[in-house]
Amino acid sequence: MDVMKLDHDSVLKELERITSKAAEVQDNILRGILERNKDTEYLSKYMNGSKDVLEFKRAVPIIIYKDIYPYIQRIANGEDSSLITGHSITEILCSSGTSAGEPKLMPTIPEDLDRRTFLYNLIIPIVNKYITGLDKGKAMYLNFVKAETSTPCGLPIRAVLTSYYKSKHFQCRPYDPFNDLTSPIQTILCEDSNQSMYCQLLAGLIHRHKVMRLGAVFASAFLRAISYLEKKWSQLCEDIRTGSLNPMITDPGCQMAMSCLLMSPNPELASEIEEICGRSSWKGILCQLWPKAKFIEAVVTGSMAQYIPALEFFSQGKIPLVCPMYASSETYFGVNVEPLSKPSDVVFTLLPNMCYFEFIPLGKNGTLSFDLDDDEQVPCDKVVDLVNVKLGRYYELVVTTFAGLYRYRIGDVLQVAGFYNGAPQFRFICRRNVVLSIDLDKTNEEDLHRSITLAKKKLGSNAFLAEYTSYADTSSVPGHYVLFWEIQGHLEPKLMEECCVAVEEELDYIYRQCRTKERSIGALEIRVVKPGTFEKLMDLIISQGGSFNQYKTPRCVKSNSATFKLLNGHVMASFFSPRDPTWVP
């Protein structure tokens, strides 16, 4: 199947086919992986050349990154791809990092691009079923690449999105009026994120009356663009007014591309934009700058959910948020077939043709319980197949890919929310390996996010929580949780103390027991950092090799890290919980 030639009807028919025959498709995927990869060093160690599915499930262990990393490292150093796959590994993908901030190197093969492209090609046809007229204008969808490095043997190391944007699948894709980007391809491929952002925003403003949808991969990237626009709108307007590009743009590709858009001065358009951007409040600014925009496309689940209030502020709640897909550097997973669902209700239909899926049950009787350590060996008979998951239950995702990951624990916790034909739909809950822990307590990303979401309401109307991360401070006895908050607006000490209390009240039973009865955890602390600190944090992480396009704020940091030092160096106020949280034996 040539995924680049599938029209909207064909790709939707294929979605129906693979989800209606999910069990059959999954069986074929696993058999195909074993047929091609049975002679690899990794599989031979467990299966002795067998391609039997039952033998695979009996003998091949369920692993985490540290188990497969030595093989990836050997390939990076020049050994043959046959260590783990029967295909040629052509790139190493550098993950954006989990919410814990740990990047990983993942093998990829050429046909992986076909699978990613198939998923991308589903998004607009699905959305078009609910939102019409997208072919009547353009999409201001902000894409970015980052400079690549290489392994000792010369394999490129790229972010997964950089890999896609540099591929023929993106650059040579057929024209689609439903997916006509405002950004010239040269601006997307510019490795200087500052110049790329400037030019892409300039292009979006030039086409402001044609833009039908807005977006970026992650909500954080889109909000970064708004922040950038707040600083640069005057210069952007000057470019439009004079018909000439700001001299700060030195990238030849950007210069050439933008010269085609800045053909002549347009003082009328510049004045329109100046009037809007010069207003005292930017509430609803997206509706005013791009009046025809019908939705904002971005990932707003998991750690991105905290950006929903900011997006709703800038859109005045008038532009729907569409969270289209669920993917990672390891493999792509699924799509949202109900794009207009509320962000809190988003579920993803896992696509059976992406890889072979398995699931580790978590907890009992449908409850969420992290009763399995990240590095604990999982019995082979504990996992269940894609089509055998149970409604309402929680699972950890496990994948087997053509590129050489076998029964690999992704680390994501999902809840079964329903079924689309024969394929289960999942709600993303959290990254299971992100925890704060002082004593017996274990606070995961979801618990932390929920607690902060409720607590920040105490700030009132004069302050706004812009960003946060956390840290388990064990330098004192007892240790305590520290939250770094960046707040826009007026700080009131009493309200900040109330926020500390509110966070603790929402943390789990064990935390409150340790805090109140056992006294093994000290009072929670909120350290308020200076405005712009989290932008500096992102700049730091990107300078260390992170991807701008895929950046996620780390939800916890370590005391000996550069990120912690940066955050702690920008603290301007500190507040502690003034009382113990409620705990009933």
Curated annotation (Swiss-Prot):
It holds the Pfam family GH3_M. Its EC number is 6.3.2.-. One of its GO terms (cellular component) is chloroplast envelope. Induction: Not induced by auxin. GO terms for molecular function: ligase activity. Keywords: Ligase. PANTHER family: GH3 DOMAIN-CONTAINING PROTEIN (PTHR31901), INDOLE-3-ACETIC ACID-AMIDO SYNTHETASE GH3.9-RELATED (PTHR31901:SF18). Belongs to the IAA-amido conjugating enzyme family. Catalyzes the synthesis of indole-3-acetic acid (IAA)-amino acid conjugates, providing a mechanism for the plant to cope with the presence of excess auxin. This is Putative indole-3-acetic acid-amido synthetase GH3.9. It comes from Arabidopsis thaliana. The gene is GH3.9.
